[in-house]
């Protein structure tokens, strides 16, 4: 039986160093992250010269526009999270994966394995969408596996002998659903004997990308006001952790209706509204959080960021959340009544077979 496995391949500009990796997405299960493993192959000349080869995990966090940068001021942090010397090999025990074992047999004596562990507290791969005309680097978090040669890992790398391969830190949806979201809000009015009550319920807490969200709305009007319109929307919350005032929200799907309205005093109304948040409907809007880009066409809205606790939030990164918001409009003098329910929007964890089929064969 012949067993095929898929790998990503990238060479340095001078063709002296080649990197092989079997995946570019690494799953964060909140408590730990999958190890980053690969194989580095050196040219015979580098081996004879006994060149030192280093591998690093680099996190690039851009928190401002390139056009706004001035001399001496950069809105970007580049952090080296892990650094290792691969060649000459250091004395360390590496537990090889099956892919590494097969590649070592295939590629010969100039092949060297490496394994790096990403810190669990490192942020997820998220970038903020730009306008189509903007060709500058997007704001957000991106990861790279960097391979270079030098006397030490602090040396400045030369472009011709350096490899930078983009990877992503991703989170997949939990296997179990949480508690069904439900909220009730009431509002009383001056010179009104009763209250206006709004009850909102979602059919579940966890949704997958592209799935329809059912918003169940129940309005009980015991006041002397008149409900003239109902609006339901999905809002994406973006928190740039580096800044104290770095929180903002974007409405990514909405629906409004006057069906059943005006809702007069003493009346009640039950209604179900359906919302589908997608990136296709927001592809021309700047500031929408999307999945980290590694030159793929299947980019989607950024998934909800899961963290073990509020104390685990790092000093950098972008935290994404989602909520359904329902508004009752009561006219110019009556104001509004709002209810909000958070929910989780994520991808289901793909099977290993599906991952291999999606990755294709060897990519440069």
Swiss-Prot record:
Phosphorylated, but does not undergo light-induced phosphorylation. Signal peptide: none annotated. Coiled coil: none annotated. One of its GO terms (molecular function) is opsin binding. Expressed specifically and abundantly in photoreceptor cells in retina and ocelli. The keyword Transmembrane does not apply. GO terms for biological process: desensitization of G protein-coupled receptor signaling pathway; endocytosis; G protein-coupled receptor internalization; negative regulation of opsin-mediated signaling pathway; negative regulation of phospholipase C-activating phototransduction signaling pathway; photoreceptor cell maintenance; sensory perception of smell; signal transduction. Keywords: Cell projection, Phosphoprotein, Sensory transduction, Vision. It is found in: Cell projection, Rhabdomere. One of its GO terms (cellular component) is cytoplasm. InterPro entries: Arrestin, Arrestin-like_C, Arrestin-like_N, Arrestin_C-like, Arrestin_CS, Arrestin_N, Ig_E-set. Regulates photoreceptor cell deactivation. Arr1 and Arr2 proteins are mediators of rhodopsin inactivation and are essential for the termination of the phototransduction cascade. Involved in regulating normal cycles of per nuclear accumulation in brain circadian neurons and thus is important for normal circadian behavior. In the dark, functions with Arr2 to promote the formation of cytosolic Bdbt foci, which are required for dco localization to photoreceptor nuclei where it phosphorylates and activates degradation of per. PANTHER family: ARRESTIN, PHOSRESTIN-2. Belongs to the arrestin family. This is Phosrestin-2. It comes from Drosophila melanogaster (Fruit fly). The lineage of its organism: Eukaryota, Metazoa, Ecdysozoa, Arthropoda, Hexapoda. The gene is Arr1.
């Amino acid at each position: 039986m012949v067993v095929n496995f898929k790998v990503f391949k990238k060479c340095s500009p001078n063709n002296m160093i080649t990197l092989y990796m079997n995946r570019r997405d690494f799953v964060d299960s909140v408590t730990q992250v999958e190890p980053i493993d690969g194989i580095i192959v050196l040219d015979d000349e580098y081996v004879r010269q006994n060149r030192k080869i280093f591998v690093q995990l680099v996190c690039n966090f851009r928190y401002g526009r390139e056009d706004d940068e001035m001399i001496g001021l950069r809105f970007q942090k580049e952090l080296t999270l892990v650094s290792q010397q691969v060649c000459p090999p250091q004395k360390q025990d590496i537990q090889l994966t099956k892919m590494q074992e097969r590649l070592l047999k295939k590629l010969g004596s100039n092949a060297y394995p490496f394994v790096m562990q990403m810190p669990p507290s490192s942020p997820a791969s998220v970038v903020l969408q730009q306008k189509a005309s903007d060709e500058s680097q997007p704001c957000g978090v991106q990861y790279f596996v960097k391979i270079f040669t030098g006397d030490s890992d602090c040396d400045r790398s030369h472009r011709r002998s350096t490899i930078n391969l983009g990877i992503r830190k991703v989170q997949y949806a939990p296997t179990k659903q949480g508690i069904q979201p439900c909220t009730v809000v009431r509002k009383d009015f001056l010179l009104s004997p009763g209250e206006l009550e709004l009850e909102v319920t979602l059919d579940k807490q966890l949704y997958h990308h592209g799935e329809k969200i059912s918003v169940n709305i129940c309005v009980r009007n015991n006041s002397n006001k008149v409900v003239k319109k109902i609006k339901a929307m999905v809002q994406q919350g973006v928190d740039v952790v580096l800044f104290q005032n770095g929180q903002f929200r974007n409405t990514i799907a909405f629906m409004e209706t006057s069906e059943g309205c005006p809702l007069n005093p003493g009346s009640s109304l039950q209604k179900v509204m359906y919302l589908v948040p997608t990136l296709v409907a927001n592809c021309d809007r700047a500031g929408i959080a999307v999945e980290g880009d590694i030159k793929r066409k299947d980019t989607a809205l950024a998934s909800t960021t899961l963290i073990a606790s509020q104390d685990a939030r790092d000093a950098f990164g972008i935290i994404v959340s989602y909520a359904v918001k329902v508004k009752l409009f009561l006219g110019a003098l009556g104001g509004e009544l709002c209810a909000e329910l958070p929910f989780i929007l994520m991808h289901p964890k793909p099977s290993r077979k599906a991952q291999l089929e999606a990755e294709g064969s060897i990519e440069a």
